[in-house]
Structures are given as C-alpha cells and as structure tokens.
C-alpha cells in the first residue's frame, strides 16, 4: 500500500503553549494577590478595579480558560494529529481558533475588573463575549471533526473519545446557561430566575469542571502518560467502561452544589446519588492511568515528567473521591460555604490540571525543538517545590474550613450560639489565609522555574514548524465483525451522536420538571419585584462581586436560623435574575440582613468596615459615595426583566425613576437624621436600599446580635 507524505502542524501547538505559560503565570499572580487580600485587605491598593470581589473571577477565568484552556488546546492539537495520522483539517481554522480564544481572554481581563459581570461562577462574562465564545468553540469543533473525518487511522483512540465528549458537552452547557436578555452592550439579566437559575448554573458549573477540566485532560493523560512511560494503556476494556459511565453519570451530579438550599429535595437527592456513583468510573480512570506505569515505576524516581504525571493522576483520584464524599449531606453540612471547598478545588486544579500540564510541556517542548530538556535537575526541583506548594496551600484551607464550620454550629451550655459574632469565626482562621498565600507563592515559583527551563530548552534546539510524517491512506472498505466498541470507533458521526444523547439525558430529567411543575417552586404572595432603586442597588452588588464573599441562602439548620433568621424559601427568589446564593461565606449570609441594621450602619460599614465590625477583612468602598447611579438605564432594566417574566406593569418604565427618586430621598433623609450627608443619586443609597430589602418579603425571626 502506497504511503502518503504529510506534515504535522507544530506551529499552532507552539502558539497555544506560549499562551499557556504566559497566562498561567498571570493567573497565578492574580491568585496570590487575592489570597493576600484575605489577610491584608489593603493589598487592593485602594482601587475599585482590584478588590477581591472583582478580581476573584478574573483569577478563576484566567486559570480555567486561559491557562488550562490553552494547555488543553495545545495537547489536543498535538496528540490528535498524531493519533489520526493527518494534519489538522484547516490551518485557517486552527489560527482563527487561537487568536479568537486569546481575544476572548483579553476581553475577560478588561471587563471583569471593570465590574462587567453576570455574577454566575465560571460564566461571569457578559453576552457579547458569550457569543464570541460560541463562535470560537464551533470553529474548534469543525476543525476537530473535520480532522477526524480525514484521518488515516481507522480506529479512534480513547483520547479522541474524550476530546469529542468535551466539544459536544461544553457546547451544550454554554448555550443553555448563557440564555440572557441584554439591557446594554455590557449588561444583561439571566433568562432564568431563582431556583431554576441556580439549578442551571450548577448543572453548568459542575459540568464545566467535568468537561473542561477533566475529560480533555483524561484524553491528554491517555496519550502522554503511555508515551512518557513507553508503555501501552493498561486496559482497553477499562477505558471503554471509564468513558461511557463517566460522561453519563457526571452530568447528573450538579445539584450536589445546592444541598440544603431551596432546590427541591428530589433534585438534591439525584445529585447526591449520582455523585456517589461517580467514584467508580473516576477511580477506573485513575487506576487505568497508574497501572499503565507497570514495569516503569523504577523510572519515576529519576524522570520528572513521570513524577508530575503520577501525582496528577493521584490528585485526580483524590479529588474525585472527595467530591462524592462532599455530596453526602452530613459532610456537605460541614464543608459547604467554607474553605474546605477551596482546598478541594485547588487539589484538583493545582494537582491534576497543573501537574499534568507541566508534565505535558516538559515532554512536548524538547521534541518540537529537536533537543533534550535543558535541566532535568531543575525540573525535579520544580516538582518538589510545586508539591510542597500544594500541601502548604491545601492543609491550612482544610483546617480553616473545619474549624470555622464547627464554630458556626457550636452552642454553649445555655443553648445559645457560642460565637454569635460571625467575625469571631473569621479572625481565628486569618493565619491560615496567610499560609495559603505562601503555598500559592511556592507553586508560582515552580512555574517560573519551568518557564526558564523551557525557554533554555527551546534556545538550545531548533523549532520544527512542520514535522514530516507518512502513513497509508484510509481505505474505504466495509469491515465486518469485531468488538462492538471497535465498530463504533470507526463511525465518528454515530459516536458523537451517542455522546450527545448520553449527556442530555441527565440534564433534561433534572431541569424539565423544575421548570414545568409549579409545585417545585411554591409561590409566596408577599414576594414582590424589586423597586427601581433596589434594582440598581442589586446591580451594584453584582458589579462589586459581593456574592463572592456573601451567600444569600439561610439553610434549615438551627445554627443558621438562630444566627440569621428564618430559613430561605424557594418562592422568595422568583424575581431574582440572576440568583445570588453564593458558594462561599468569607462574610456572613445576607439573605435576612434587611431591617437588621439601620441605614447609617450600612453607610459607615461600606465606608469603613472596621468602624462597625472591628477585625473585618472586608475592604472599604469609597467610590460608592462619589459615583452616581445611571437613571437612564432604569427603563431598559425594567423592560428586560418584564421580558423574562417579572410582573412590572406595562408602561411602568416611564415612571420608574419617579419611584426611584422618592425612595432615595427617604433614605437620604434618614441618613441626614443620623448626621450623614449624601447625594440621593449616590450608588451607596441604591446599595443600602437593596440590602434593606433582603429577606423582608416574609416575616423574619429574631437573629443573633452583633453579627
């Protein structure tokens, strides 16, 4: 059979690798900055653009989509060409994908510090950027599927299965979660409200972790680990079971992020059951990876690439065991809203994604530059300092999470909360926040070492932009018999269709009843839409990222109802576009804060948090007192919310600003009575109006004092 000559495109891989390293360092630096702000609030430099609430999503987006995302594309473009024995389908699409993705990252880097955010975790970017993401993701998909169709290898290797699942599922997740109604060029409201929005968001949020941070890297593991170890994958059959069970089960597990919330109990239970089931396929993948090293463990001692990959696969196993354990209600009751979750996320992010990326880069660079790694010794140092960084980061966070949760729940002998002041539970863990920053700095130092090592490696070699290869053409002939999955691997269109069906089942079964059966979200007659002033205040709350530190969900625990008041009901959130339940309590829950403190207290708290809450790690927000709300946007906001079902009367937008000014004047007069002067158009007035509204639509029980 005649061999065909062709060339692999290494240049596109190089571009994605350069972006990976640069954005990795930037994302880690932003992470160190926000970690520092938790024990040194002044580290925001007094600027509104560098506060924790605004740059925490910048850190998560930089790490997930810029660092891990670019690394994923580098690994996919490198391995796919070699596994399919063909160049990528279209060079034009490859480079359109690269530059489009970098422009999206640049847009995120500009808009998030400006406070242009939807507030939804891992989906904070506003609607024009969402559209750009959709277009570029389709470009990636066309290029990938086109490459599969023009392949010279009949069977699709296991790594390709995971790449297909990644493309299909992320596309579905992004489209469903990004339904929003635009107000301006950079302001929109989620199409969904309250409980429904929470379910869709965490269906997306959980599976973004599953299908952006997990499945593509399992594909990368299945390619690069056998290459680095010079051993075949341990079990083909195990990889089949691993793949199909993982993608089917994973999609159901999102509700475990919403245990003890206002989400219907049946949905919470589904999330718990499928999360526990996830242990089996996840550990199947981990064991398949580790057992691939059989006969090569002696090399792990000397080879830094294998070291990184072994720890990465082990971290994957630990994270995918801990995740299901955290979905058990009794465990979740302790861990949720605490730094335990931060530790869990970072063991996966730093250990699984980070270390696998490092191992991949150390393996690829010497081969694309036709040389050897500049310094194996320096790579080994990187491994040990990175491992130490993970330990120094994670252990204090696990400790902080358990300590703070137990303090929240502790009652004294008289039956009262032992620590009614939330700040008492914060000051105890501030030293652990400092240790967290040290751990992050160690990990970052290792990444700097790697960057130096890779640059020196490239300089001592010569880049091979187009790597020559040859393979026979794929014959068009009918093959009968064989293992059923072997037959499926020869039919990429059918394979992709089955993946789509597998991932849609769970989402449809969880979401459709929540949207269609009204009893899932009982209505409460006293719950009314936000006033125009409160609506502006809510948007300021979103802009400042307050939901990054404060929850708005009182769970049905005695410790929480004693501290905050009546537990939260599903019907209270029917006009919340988007929901703002939060996932972390660096500060207290705010769902029942309305009418708890007077207006002067809120005014002083935002101007100088320590004046009202000694020991607070919250920074001041002086710009709220000088910046004014834009009343020109009021009508557009009212119309947009009416479009998504909020019952504002037809034509109300024409008189909404009159109500806004009247309510603002009431607050200004009240502040003046407390010897505080402020303009009625100041942003702080709108924010106070919103905070005073929270939780007041239903009767609030007495709460702990001095919160």
What are these regions (language model features)?
Residues 2-15, 297, 477-488:
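Cytosolic juxtamembrane amphipathic/interface segments immediately preceding
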Residues 518-542, 556-557, 586, 672-679, ...:
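Electrostatic cytochrome c docking/interface patches
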Residues 14-45, 49-116, 127-148, 160-185, ...:
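Hydrophobic cores of alpha-helical transmembrane segments in multi-pass integral membrane proteins
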Residues 537, 543-552, 602, 687, ...:
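The canonical Cys-X-X-Cys-His
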């Amino acid at each position: 059979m005649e061999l065909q000559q062709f060339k692999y495109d290494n240049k596109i891989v190089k571009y994605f690798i350069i972006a990976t390293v640069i954005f990795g360092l930037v994302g880690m630096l932003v992470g160190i900055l926000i970690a520092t702000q938790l024990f040194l609030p002044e580290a925001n430099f007094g600027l509104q653009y560098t506060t924790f609430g605004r740059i925490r999503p910048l850190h998560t987006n930089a790490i997930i989509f810029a660092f891990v995302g670019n690394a994923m594309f580098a690994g996919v473009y490198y391995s796919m060409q070699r596994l399919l024995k063909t160049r990528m389908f279209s060079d034009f699409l490859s480079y359109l994908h690269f530059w489009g993705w970098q422009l999206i990252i640049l847009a995120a880097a500009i808009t998030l510090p400006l406070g242009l955010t939807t507030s939804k975790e891992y989906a904070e970017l506003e609607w024009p950027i969402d559209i750009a993401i959709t277009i570029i993701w389709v470009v990636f998909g066309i290029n990938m599927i086109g490459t599969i169709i023009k392949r010279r290898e009949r069977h699709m290797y296991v790594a390709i299965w995971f790449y297909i699942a990644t493309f299909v599922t992320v596309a579905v997740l992004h489209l469903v979660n990004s339904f929003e109604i635009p107000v301006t060029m950079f302001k929109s409201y989620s199409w969904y409200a309250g409980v429904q929005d929470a379910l869709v968001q965490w269906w997306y949020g959980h599976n973004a972790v599953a299908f952006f941070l997990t499945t593509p890297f399992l594909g990368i593991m299945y390619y690069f680990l056998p290459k680095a170890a010079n051993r075949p994958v341990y079990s083909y059959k195990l990889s089949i079971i691993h793949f199909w069970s993982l993608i089917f089960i994973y999609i159901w597990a999102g509700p475990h992020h919403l245990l003890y919330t206002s989400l219907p109990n049946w949905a919470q239970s589904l999330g718990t059951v499928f999360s526990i089931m996830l242990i089996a396929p996840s550990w199947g993948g981990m064991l398949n990876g580790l057992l691939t090293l059989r006969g090569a463990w002696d090399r792990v001692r000397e080879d830094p690439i294998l070291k990184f990959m072994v720890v990465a696969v082990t971290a994957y196993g630990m994270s995918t065991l801990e995740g299901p354990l955290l979905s058990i209600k009794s465990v979740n009751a302790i861990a949720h809203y605490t730094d335990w979750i931060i530790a869990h996320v970072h063991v996966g992010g730093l250990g699984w994604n980070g270390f696998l990326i490092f191992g991949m880069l150390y393996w690829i660079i010497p081969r694309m530059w036709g040389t050897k790694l500049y310094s194996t010794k320096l790579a080994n140092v990187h491994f040990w300092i990175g491992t130490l960084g993970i330990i120094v980061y994670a252990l204090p966070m696990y400790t902080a999470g358990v300590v703070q949760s137990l303090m929240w729940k502790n009652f004294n002998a008289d039956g009262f909360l032992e620590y009614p002041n939330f700040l008492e539970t914060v000051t105890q863990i501030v030293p652990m926040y400092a240790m967290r920053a040290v751990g992050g700095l160690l990990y970052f130092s290792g990444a700097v070492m790697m960057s130096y090592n890779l640059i020196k490696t490239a300089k001592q070699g010569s880049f091979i932009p187009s790597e020559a290869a040859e393979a026979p053409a794929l014959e068009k002939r009918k093959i009968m018999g064989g293992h059923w999955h072997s037959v499926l691997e020869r039919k990429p269109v059918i394979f992709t269709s089955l993946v789509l069906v597998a991932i849609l089942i769970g989402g449809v079964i969880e979401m459709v009843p929540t949207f269609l059966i009204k009893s899932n979200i009982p209505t409460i007659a006293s719950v009314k839409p936000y006033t125009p002033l409160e609506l502006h205040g809510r948007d300021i709350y979103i802009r400042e990222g307050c939901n990054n530190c404060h929850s708005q969900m009182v769970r049905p625990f005695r410790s929480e109802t004693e501290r905050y008041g009546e537990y939260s009901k599903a019907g209270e959130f029917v006009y919340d576009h988007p929901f703002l339940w939060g996932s972390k309590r660096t500060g207290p829950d705010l769902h029942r804060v309305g009418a708890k403190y007077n207006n002067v207290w809120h005014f002083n708290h935002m101007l100088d948090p320590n004046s009202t809450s000694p020991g607070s790690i919250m920074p001041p927000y002086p710009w709220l007192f000088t910046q004014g709300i834009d009343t020109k946007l009021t009508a557009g906001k009212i119309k947009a919310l009416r479009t998504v079902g909020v019952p504002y009367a037809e034509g109300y937008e024409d008189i909404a600003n009159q109500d806004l000014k009247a309510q603002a004047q009431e607050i200004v007069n009240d502040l003046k009575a407390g010897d505080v002067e402020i303009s009625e158009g100041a942003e702080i007035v709108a924010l106070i109006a919103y905070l005073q509204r929270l939780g007041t639509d239903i009767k609030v029980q007495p709460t702990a004092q001095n919160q």
